[in-house]
A protein has these predicted regions:
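Short, solvent-exposed loop/turn elements at beta->coil junctions and helix N-caps
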Residues: 10-18, 104-105, 111-113, 117, ...
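Short, aliphatic-rich beta-strand segments
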Residues: 116, 123-132, 191-195
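Auxiliary alpha/beta "docking" domains used to position bulky ligands
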Residues: 72, 79, 121, 140, ...
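Rossmann-like S-adenosyl-L-methionine
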Residues: 138-377
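Extended interfacial segments that mediate partner engagement and assembly in macromolecular machines
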Residues: 1-101, 136
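Short beta-strand elements
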Residues: 20-33, 56-64, 116-118, 175, ...
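A short, glycine/Asx- and small/polar-enriched loop/turn
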Residues: 19-23, 123-124, 366-369
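Short, acidic/hydrophobic/Gly-rich beta-strand patch recurrent on exposed beta strands
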Residues: 61-64, 128-130, 268
């Protein structure tokens, strides 16, 4: 009901080689069948370095849909091969160093999860080992052996999570066991620092497609003030500030990034600094409240870039956006249902939907990322 005769609906932008694309791989480690002659390692939580072999075989891989049952997998056509190799190497080293896998029901065991991040262009690997306790006595040998088995690894981080929960990363502290504690990747001609908590798209190839199309839809000429709402670590905002490789004149004069996650804003500022970008500022604040404040202060905005979470935006944000009345809105969404709801609101309040571009960010799944471009009538 909100698309007009002139709205352009582009075909889905697919991926040429839709395999091994996931640059973030997460695996739980859980006990499987009992092993013959196995005895519980010393210490109530089966900590690293204890004597004795694990009581159970160790399962790692992925959860069956809608369950907590782990499907033991040695390979996956969607996961980066080096990342998968690291997951399996950790399982092997757990057996060697007598580290018990985590039992969620009993809250026992030592190794809970591994989260592997891969730099698509650099090939660097960040391994985050989530442990049920701070003590990691064999950490130096563990890291040395892990690096031997997976030479692409450039850093290893320990994340502590002792809570009886299925939340993966804990908030009880992190320790860098090897390397700098982060990796570097390149996207649209910019470099980005990725740590264990950083948000970063899991398909770098299609992210380039997504961002290029979004920047093109913004029609930057070098004079605009743009806002990157729900900016995360600032990726698309920084691309807007600098311009795409080969088309650097098509950029915003000034970019304001806003997100309510303080650690993401810290990363965004650091990303701006090491890319030498001085025309982008980032603020840790609720996007809706920030927009409301700008509207009340009489600020003007030419282009609004927005990439909200799956739940979509909210009426406060959309109302403030309409008050600021940017000439163009480029709305990126991982949930076309909530995007349609929000776009309908914008169309009812003075905007025209001009173009729609779906991008297949997750081949072989039913998920699609969608970009909508709107212009003020």
């Amino acid at each position: 009901p909100f698309a007009g005769e002139g709205t352009v609906f582009n075909p889905i932008a697919g991926m040429d080689e839709p395999y091994y694309y996931r640059n973030k791989v997460t695996s739980p480690y859980v006990p499987g069948r009992k092993t013959k002659g196995g005895k519980r390692p010393q210490g109530k939580k089966g900590n690293a370095g204890a004597k004795g072999a694990p009581q159970h075989e160790i399962l790692c891989g992925m959860y069956a849909a809608g369950t907590h049952r782990v499907i033991n997998t040695d390979s996956c056509l969607l996961e980066n091969k080096d990342a998968k190799q690291a997951v399996l190497a950790i399982r092997s080293l757990m057996q060697r160093y007598h580290m018990e896998p985590y039992n969620e029901d009993a809250n026992t065991g030592f190794i809970r999860h591994a989260v592997i991040r891969v730099g698509h262009t650099t090939g660097e690997l960040l391994v985050t080992v989530v442990t049920n306790g701070k003590e990691f006595p064999a950490s130096r040998n563990f890291c040395r052996e892990l690096k031997k088995r997976c030479p692409a690894i450039t850093t290893v981080v320990q994340n502590v999570n002792t809570r009886q929960t299925n939340v993966i990363l804990g908030d009880e502290g992190e320790k860098t066991l090897y390397g700098p504690g982060f990796i570097i990747d390149e996207l649209c001609g910019l470099t980005f620092r990725i740590s264990s908590h950083s948000f970063y798209q899991v398909n770098a190839t299609q992210t380039e497609v997504l961002y290029r199309k979004a920047i093109e839809m913004a029609h930057f000429t070098g004079t605009e003030t743009a806002m990157d709402a729900y900016c995360g670590t600032g990726t698309i905002g920084l691309v807007a500030a600098k311009g795409l490789p080969g088309a650097e004149t098509a950029h915003a004069a000034r970019v304001i990034g806003v997100d309510n996650v303080a650690s993401a804003i810290k990363d965004a500022r650091e990303n701006a600094r090491h890319n030498g970008i001085e025309n982008a500022d980032f603020t840790a604040e609720d996007a809706g409240q920030f927009m409301d404040k700008l509207a009340k202060e009489g600020e003007s905005l030419d282009v609004l870039l927005m990439d909200p979470p799956r739940a979509g935006s909210n009426e406060q944000f959309l109302r403030s956006a309409c008050s600021l009345a940017p000439k163009r809105i480029v709305y990126i969404s991982c949930n076309p249902n909530t995007q349609a709801r929000d776009v309908e609101y914008l169309v009812k309040h003075g905007y025209r939907l001009t173009e729609v571009q779906p991008v297949d960010m997750f081949p072989h799944t039913n998920h699609v990322e969608n970009i909508c471009a709107l212009e003020l009538q």
